[in-house]
């Protein structure tokens, strides 16, 4: 089973960590095994934190809508998978949380389900499965945070902030292109005006 604590793995993770190190003028590392290099270990930790932080907002590439989760036949428990960042009811309310590795319904105050539940899932994706603009955003944001915490060069901060802003803008464009958003549909006020 994969570890979702370290969801950024292999050559892609090494490349991302080296990009973070390069942002402050540090030489690249050839491996992340053992975390012998303190800077590489810190960069890796920040990279994984930022990866989870950005993905937890929910984007077109990691939201799965209308998924039915079925309880175990004997225990009536639904396992809360390690790659779930958030479960929401299909009405958009976040009534389901992780309690002891199982789905817990805060409304009924129970982790036992007689039947399946239909939810929208924000799922933690592997780094390689994400669109390029999101990988770029994660690395630039992690680089800026790494600089702030361990290096603190204001001239580097300015450059990294510009790169992060550009990366975020590219992600917003991606969402607009692939999100299927429509200003005439999904807004109660606009729908009311159109049906007059």
UniProtKB/Swiss-Prot annotation:
Coiled coil stretches, renumbered:
none
Gene Ontology BP term (one) = symbiont genome ejection through host cell envelope, short tail mechanism
Any idea which UniProt keywords this protein has?
Viral genome ejection through host cell envelope, Viral penetration into host cytoplasm, Viral short tail ejection system, Viral tail protein, Viral tail tube protein, Virion, Virus entry into host cell
Residue span of the signal peptide, if any?
Answer: none
Give its localization.
Virion
Query: What Pfam families is this protein classified in?
Result: Tube (PF17212)
For this UniProt entry, what is the primary localization, expressed as one broad class? virion
* A cellular component term, taken from the record's GO annotations: virus tail, tube
* Stated family: Belongs to the tail tubular protein gp11 family.
Describe the subunit structure: Interacts with head-to-tail connector protein gp8, the tail component gp12, and the fiber protein gp17.
Give the function comment from the record. Answer: Structural component of the short non-contractile tail. The tail complex is involved in viral genome delivery. Forms the 12-fold symmetric toroidal domain immediately below the connector protein gp8. Once the tail tubular structure is formed, the interface between gp11 and gp12 generates the proper environment to interact with the six fibers, each made of gp17 trimers.
Q: What is this protein called?
A: Tail tubular protein gp11
Specify the species: Escherichia phage T7 (Bacteriophage T7)
